[in-house]
Amino acid sequence: MAHKTFISYKYSEAQDLRDRIIKALGDDASYYQGETSDSPDLTDTSTENIKKNLKDMMYDTSVTIVIISPHIKESKWIDWEIEYCLKNITRKNRTSHTNGVVGVIMKVNGGYDWFKYTSTKLDGCSVTNYYDSKVYDIINNNRYNQHPKVYSCNQCKCVNALTGSYIAFVEEDEFLSNPQKYINNAYDKSEKDAEGYNLTKQR
């Protein structure tokens, strides 16, 4: 089943990946509610007008795709967009559902080591780590927040990459090869108002 999606991204460095994600959605791109290369330029518009346009795009969506790019934190909008998508917003007696969220890590210079690295636990388990300082607190606070936690390994206490965090991180190549898999995973976690996760909805 297709879900209405919104892509949150830093325009100056991620618009190409945004376009490739929309293309990878195939027929499901008709459910995409966010900006495209044909969207009007709002650069010189007031902050309130930009917010109104973004709210109109986001309100009816159920999954937010956040592009994790090197200068994401320089954006004035992304953390606000994530906060809006996580909240239950009421319009005309209808309350929106908390969105599922997936973070797509941009490939830079042919790889992802600008943001992720692997380490080995004492028991021999290999785990993926991330440079948390490169993303917003609202993203970090919704990582490893499954409740109760379900461990992939009870000895080293590592968790599943997709279900252990409300906001899972997925490499660009993996996401583009099967976007529906990761969109569905994000949506499934949002069911019953994200029951099973301790959500942080404030920036």
Language-model features and meaning:
Residues N88-R94:
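Conserved RecA-like P-loop NTPase helicase motor core
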Residues H71-N88:
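Conserved TIR/SEFIR loop-to-helix hotspot centered on a Trp-containing motif
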Residues M1-V63, R94-H97, Y166-R203:
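Conserved N-terminal substructure of TIR/SEFIR domains
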Residues D16-D19, K76-W80, Y112-K116:
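A short acidic (Asp/Glu
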